[in-house]
Amino acid sequence: MTKFVFVTGGVVSSLGKGIAAASLAAILESRGLKVTLLKLDPYINVDPGTMSPFQHGEVFVTEDGAETDLDLGHYERFITAKMRKVNNFTTGQIYESVIRKERRGEYLGKTVQVIPHITNEIQDYIHRGAEGFDVALVEIGGTVGDIESLPFLEAARQLSLRAGRNAAAFVHLTLVPYLASAGELKTKPTQHSVQKLREIGISPDALLCRADRQIPDDERAKISLFSNVQEDAVISVWDADTIYKIPQMLHDQGLDRIVCEKLALSPKPADLSMWTKLVHSLENPKDSVTIGMVGKYVDLTESYKSLTEALRHAGIHTESRVNIEYLDSEEIENTGPQCLAKYDAILVPGGFGKRGVEGKIASARFARESKIPYLGICLGMQVALIEYARDVAGLTKANSTEFDADTEQPVVALINEWQNHDGKVERRDANSDLGGTMRLGAQTCAVKPGTLAAEIYGSEVTERHRHRYEANNHYLGRVEDAGLIVSARTPTESLCEIMELPRTVHPWYVGVQYHPEFKSTPRDGHPLFISFIKAALAHKHAGQAKK
């Protein structure tokens, strides 16, 4: 039978519930338990796919094509289990499901209410995602006290009651702020947060107390007394310079022991040696590179969370510190790309919309002409294709129909029909809904022998997608004749997956239509990013040799 650990948050949002839950899951997995994580989001959107990155941050895509919360990216980076659609659901999905059942008459004429119908549906979703695992950690989004979170907290309380003794544990993450004017940590917000949770009928088994410093024993004793939580279960979680230190921090204070005792589990001792090695590699690099990332969401770096982590993972596996500088593509559009000359490599990530796109195109051209390593992801590949078509292949009016619906030379265009991850044919047009109508999830394709892509991936590549627009096959022949290499295509539609420049022309210039960052983990890194960082190191050293 699956055991449950519910992770809640109090006082303020963005305390790091996802990191805390993923870190605890990593410790439990190291103890030999089969572990998964679920994220319950209390917003009414069906999924985050149509939400602005400024509102929500990154949208993480699973192997089976779900557009999910960025916390699922943390989950995959901390444990070995792959996330699926069932690992993330929202208030919107719950209500949509209940209303469909009501319309079909499944409630037999009863008045449909939050309790029991909504809360039962939430529990059904939780059980579905947890099936087949020893322990499921369930992160409840939002903050205790928010009206949106109440049905999820009530469902967690009911599930705990129904599951019986030793079947569920509650871990509450809260803030202990430091008041500089008073020169002390303040525990009152935590006391009130726990009190609010207990009013709902939930008594936490452990408190994770976030602060900018370690919390002294006397303050932990005070929190214990007023929150009715054992003193050894009041865990101090202070700011760390890398999230990969958190598993060791929680283990050193016995959080996994407390949870295992509550759940009546007796697994083998934890082995966190892998995390120790990762942290050592991060803290003891032998070299460094600086990457210029040209995007439109640079004011909120959460929009590129998986990408940032993927670059850091590549740094771990190349013994290098990867410094990332975020550059606004609109500023480059206005002032020119000369500011990119100082970087060891240039990366243009995915994105949507016309704003700042000419700055990205200019960045791709600068990287190509200056022989600076370039990686274009999704839109980053498309702008590189547009630039090459305009400036090399003679298609001077080349553009994407995303930016100019009436362009005379649509080298990038809307996909009307494609196969999803399980082979089902999907169709859309310009009038289709925005939500859930993209090419989503993992797909496999063959790689052209003798290319840089083949050197990186081998003969085959499986990566995750999230896009509506593709390179237009009608124009690819012209661009290939001008020297660009299409080094991977989809097997059915022959859509461009990877493009590159010959190494006789440029040392490392690659564009990919998919999102490789979603598959990178600190354990293994990702071959594309590792190759990219190696190219950046080579460019840096070549520049130093010339001086």
From Swiss-Prot:
GO terms for biological process, alphabetical: 'de novo' CTP biosynthetic process; pyrimidine nucleobase biosynthetic process
Cellular component per GO, a single term: cytosol
Keyword Nucleotide-binding: yes
Keywords (A to Z) from UniProt: ATP-binding, Glutamine amidotransferase, Ligase, Magnesium, Metal-binding, Nucleotide-binding, Pyrimidine biosynthesis
Residues reported to bind CTP: 13, 146-148, 186-191, 222
Domain of life, per lineage: Bacteria
Annotated catalytic residues: 378 (nucleophile), 515, 517
Pathway: Pyrimidine metabolism; CTP biosynthesis via de novo pathway; CTP from UDP: step 2/2
UniProt: Mg(2+) binding residues: 71, 139
Remaining remarks: CTPSs have evolved a hybrid strategy for distinguishing between UTP and CTP. The overlapping regions of the product feedback inhibitory and substrate sites recognize a common feature in both compounds, the triphosphate moiety. To differentiate isosteric substrate and product pyrimidine rings, an additional pocket far from the expected kinase/ligase catalytic site, specifically recognizes the cytosine and ribose portions of the product inhibitor.
The protein's role, per its UniProt record: Catalyzes the ATP-dependent amination of UTP to CTP with either L-glutamine or ammonia as the source of nitrogen. Regulates intracellular CTP levels through interactions with the four ribonucleotide triphosphates.
NCBIfam families to which the protein is assigned, alphabetical: PRK05380.1 (NF003792), PyrG (TIGR00337)
Oligomeric and partner information: Homotetramer.
Name under which the protein is recorded: CTP synthase
Gene transcribed to yield this protein: pyrG
